Amino acid sequence: MKKTTMLKKNYEFKTVLTKGKCFKEEKIEIFVNKNNKKRNLLGIAIGTKNGKAFQRNRAKRIIRECYTRLENQLIDGNSIVILINKNYDINEITFAEILKEMQIIFENAKLLKKEDEIWKKYLYI
């Protein structure tokens, strides 16, 4: 079951970017803010100066897929905005690099569940 909905409104992005905490790695930045919902809210933002539209869309698809791989391990109730650094060449983006960086950032932000909590869902304990 999908636990995440997308941020769509401009004011939703602004509140996360202004009130949230920032965690950076080489290629991506993640802003995290608590919300009062049982779901995570995800927003992906890439500036128009980062390549052409098809390159930005490809990067968004890669980021979305990386997020869905890590979604079951995340604690619920957060608004998350993911940005790609301006200086990074968007053509060189790879799935493995982004997944690794997202995992590191989520660990630093303490958003990952403990392994016991993850397995309880599958074992019905």
Regions found by a protein language model. Give the residues of each.
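Positively charged, solvent-exposed patches that mediate nucleic-acid binding
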Residues: 1-125
